[in-house]
Amino acid sequence: MRCPKCSSEESKVVDSRQAEDAIRRRRVCESCGFRFTTFERIEEMPLLVIKKDDKREPFNREKIVRGLVRSAYKRPVSSEDIETTVANVERKIRQLDSNEVESDVIGEFVMQELAELDDITYIRFASVYRSFKDVSELEELLKNITKK
């Protein structure tokens, strides 16, 4: 690993620890003695989302966050709940073993998570995601929720 101070290629690891999504390594340059930190992460496949019009765009977790924040407005859903939900959805997507996923699949994963979190947030999200044509479709969703 190149030293950021003297650019020497000779350094040794003096400490390794697991960080959130990486391994944190403390290093010391063998030439100048400078100590520095590096992080080692797994390089994940870039995810592409296949939209309804068959266009592809990079996966953007912030879009899910924004949708959840809107759906959870004035509901007892914390930002931590939203972050956990998004992390669970992203984990499910990455477990699909493909670097392309249809937007419908993402929406269904979000719905599964919201069904466990908060009914009103679930209904709000579903009303936008499923684009209900009339009240009967919403009534059907409400019947399914009340059966829980």
UniProtKB/Swiss-Prot annotation:
The lineage of its organism: Bacteria, Bacillati, Bacillota, Bacilli, Lactobacillales. The keyword Coiled coil does not apply. One of its GO terms (molecular function) is DNA binding. Its cofactor is Zn(2+). Pfam families: ATP-cone, Zn_ribbon_NrdR. Negatively regulates transcription of bacterial ribonucleotide reductase nrd genes and operons by binding to NrdR-boxes. The keyword Cell inner membrane does not apply. Binds 1 zinc ion. It comes from Lactococcus lactis subsp. lactis (strain IL1403) (Streptococcus lactis). GO terms for biological process: negative regulation of DNA-templated transcription. Residues 47-137 form the ATP-cone domain. InterPro entries: ATP-cone_dom, NrdR-like_N, RNR_NrdR-like. Keywords: ATP-binding, DNA-binding, Metal-binding, Nucleotide-binding, Repressor, Transcription, Transcription regulation, Zinc, Zinc-finger. This is Transcriptional repressor NrdR. Belongs to the NrdR family. A zinc finger (unnamed) spans 3-32. The gene is nrdR.
